[in-house]
Amino acid sequence: MNFYITTPIYYTNDIPHIGHAYTSIACDIIARYNKLLGNNVFFLTGTDEHGQKVEKAAINSNLEPKEFVDKLSVNFINLIPFLGCEIDDFIRTTEKRHIKASQELWKKLEKNNQIYLSNYEGWYSEIGRASCRERV
């Protein structure tokens, strides 16, 4: 059986912290367990180098966003062997292969009417970085 696992793709708005280590190790444990079961495992991790958080952090560091993420992504790349994790691939959202794959996926979804415009109403916490549901 094929088994695919990925960490969250980490934001490059700051250096790695204990949460990054926790999820990387947890995914590594699951990947290793599935290998022991005889599954064909593919373990991916990487960095999300887009978004307002990244842009704000770059501005605060007086760097261009691409220069900022290039410097920070190295910390995430180095985190994996430091933790003893065994991944199959590390991807950055600024890589050409990621951009190409994302565009191809978008086109497939669009062709199958899976992308549509809609309205959303609700509260969003910038501090918690989450949508908040109202209690009824």
Which role does the model predict for each range below?
Residues 1-135:
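N-terminal, positively charged nucleic-acid-binding surface of large information/translation enzymes
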